[in-house]
Amino acid sequence: MPNLLGKVRALQAEGVSAWMYTSNYAYPPTTLTSCVRDDLYFVPEVLGVKIAMGDHRSSFPTQEEVMRLLTQIRVGAMVAGKLGVLHIHLGNIVGPFDMLLECVKRGMPIQHIRPTHCARHPDVFKGAIEFGLAGGYVDITTGGSCAVGSPAHGVKSVLEAGVAADHITMSSDGHGSVPRFNDKGEMIGLGVGGVACNLKEVKRLIGELGVPMTTALSVITSNVAKALQLPGKGVVKAGNCADLNLFDENMNLVHVFAKGRQMMRNGEIIVKGTFEE
């Protein structure tokens, strides 16, 4: 965890915005301080906690353990002036949404519960739509496998099911580890997730599926900022951070600005990381 925090702060020093979730897949969670509550309170960069559910990476926490974790997140975030979220890595084992919706029925505000990889299994996708209709956020991963045609098709299906457009997000899972399995479920290799897939799926939403540009762009901009309560992010307006992507008429990325500093010019990266050439 200290290494992760160090990387977040290194990215900030290099001119981009960065935050983190504490822990990994496991329960009990791994923390920087003595507990999840204190991580949220004492570490500005920590927005929440990550665990896995319904997946071979999961520790399969019980209903009561998930509730206790959510209460720690809620209390720590309230004191720190943050939203506080439980970021949940979903797998191919069905059932997690039953547990998550039970937490909501018991009184836990749904905005603290954030499942991701919602379209990698048909039954999990159905559960995600039910969760979205209950007021939760549905996050479609643009990298890796997708059980509904493409991530863009997943977003359109969630929209057509009646989930609020501002409660749908996409994330790349970029730079995450990507294991490769054979037909027996045996791991045969390990790769690294790419970061270009968000833009690819936004283009598909607009060009192939006819989703309005404002709606398509919002799933990787304003919706994300709203979902995580990131002040000054996600919307271009006076007083906000000058994070800007400029495209040509064919939706090719031409210029990029991060906090007002130009990072890409005419398709060429002009600002690189400390150890990049």
Regions found by a protein language model. Name each.
Residues H117, I140-T142, S172-G174, L217-I220, ...:
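Active-site proximal loops enriched in glycine and acidic residues that flank catalytic Cys/His/Asp
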Residues A161-L246:
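His/Asp/Glu-enriched, well-ordered alpha-helical/loop segment
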Residues P2-G6, P61-E64, R68, D98, ...:
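Conserved active-site and cofactor/substrate-binding residues in soluble primary-metabolism enzymes
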Residues E65, T71-F181, E186-G189:
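Active-site core of metal-dependent hydrolases
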Residues M1-G76, L90, F97-C103:
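Active-site loop-helix segments enriched in His/Asp/Glu that coordinate
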Residues V235-E277:
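C-terminal cap of metal-dependent C-N hydrolases
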